[in-house]
């Protein structure tokens, strides 16, 4: 399983800019429709759809390629075939069939998109291997907050596309949208930061100290308060569990 990164996205708007659309909920639905499902879940495929060619109906059990290296081996066979102009040696009918299905599709995908398989494509274009997971959405009068998890990293490619969409709203007369993304890895104190979009301007902060990383972790993953951490007289955060080696009997934290 991956390390999960918790992402908290808050989208705010100025009511006067959008009041011609309707009430607060109607405005939120207007803003969010291009990247949320009808169930109000953040959907990466609405912003950057996975090409149909990555959904080919392959069955690894019917080929000689191990599933863990399926597309890579088939791609290599087909690449050798294209490069040499002849069939690789010692290839039986079953492997030959796989080469011209999985291998050819992987080769064509790489030539077109720079990624042979869905995993590489998602990492390249989304910035993470899976769509948003464990999503929750909270709506208020002038903003919406969506919290969701991603594998290994915050989805940088998705944020870039989202900001382009907000730029387009700005250009057609809908200013006043602000979007803030705070993220924190489940690995305490690491891989944390904040991205802010405001009226076409983007700022990115990657927390540079362990203490800042813990502060972000507490904010994003614990709702701003967690007994597992404490702040010293200089304002730096510390992790009880780390300092006491996981010995709960000695640790003063009430968690």
List each language-model region with its residue ranges.
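Intrinsic low-complexity, intrinsically disordered or marginally ordered coil/linker segments
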Residues: 1-255
